[in-house]
Amino acid sequence: MRLAMPSGNQEPRRDPELKRKAWLAVFLGSALFWVVVALLIWKVWG
């Protein structure tokens, strides 16, 4: 799967605010996933 990266000069009607919220959501989702994984491992070996 190839991701087409838009070049800087042709930014299609995208908020920097929206992009920041998207990155924040990705970061929080990833952090939540790893917390759940750590808790499962802790319960298995606890």
Curated annotation (Swiss-Prot):
It is a single-pass membrane protein. Induction: Constitutively expressed (at protein level). Pfam families: YmiA-like. It is found in: Cell inner membrane. InterPro entries: YmiA_put-like. Disulfide bonds: none annotated. One of its GO terms (cellular component) is plasma membrane. Its main location: membrane. Keywords: Cell inner membrane, Cell membrane, Membrane, Transmembrane, Transmembrane helix. The chain crosses the membrane at residues 22-42. This is Protein YmiA.
